[in-house]
């Protein structure tokens, strides 16, 4: 069956979902090459390179604004997961069908250049509170599914949702050098 073409400048979640659905490694590699972008490479490096050490606390991302507290409680991770669940239930996660309201104000394609702030050796002088605040601000601006990806990557758990291996990534992008980053 033919592979769906994604729109120009697709969201990261659209690329990863499409690649993850492929049964063969060859198809996965082909699509990773087709939708190659520095932002996707950076996320894969953070996720799969053991020498990249996250400076963010592992697990749930704690956050609630005053407005949010009146509506619900819980962490930002919980809120992202609730939005993702609602979108999946309403089938609004299919390629390009997410409503504009839920799309967010920015994308990982735009924000990836800030990721160095969250890893060891990137911006070590940044105070923990400032780093965590910056991370939360980025998450709040992203489409919920891209925010979920960023939360998975910070804990090196991308494979839990997207069945794309380090080997798939290494084959698609042989110029990535693994190790020696921290």
Role assignments for model-derived ranges:
Residues 1-182:
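N-terminal nucleic-acid-engaging modules of covalent nucleotidyltransferase systems
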């Amino acid at each position: 069956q033919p592979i769906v073409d994604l729109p120009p400048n697709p969201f990261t979640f659209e690329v990863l979902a499409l690649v993850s659905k492929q049964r063969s490694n060859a198809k996965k590699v082909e699509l990773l090459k087709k939708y190659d972008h520095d932002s996707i490479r950076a996320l894969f490096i953070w996720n799969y390179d053991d020498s990249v050490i996250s400076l963010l606390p592992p697990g749930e991302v704690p956050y609630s604004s005053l407005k949010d507290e009146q509506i619900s409680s819980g962490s930002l991770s919980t809120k992202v997961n609730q939005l993702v669940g609602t979108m999946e239930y309403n089938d609004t996660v299919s390629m390009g069908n997410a409503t504009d309201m839920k799309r967010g104000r920015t994308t990982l394609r735009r924000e990836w250049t800030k990721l160095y702030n969250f890893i060891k050796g990137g911006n070590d002088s940044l105070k923990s509170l400032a780093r965590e605040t910056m991370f939360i601000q980025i998450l709040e601006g992203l489409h919920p599914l891209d925010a979920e990806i960023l939360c998975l990557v910070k804990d090196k758990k991308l494979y839990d949702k997207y069945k794309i291996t380090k080997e798939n990534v290494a084959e698609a992008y042989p110029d990535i050098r693994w190790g020696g980053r921290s």
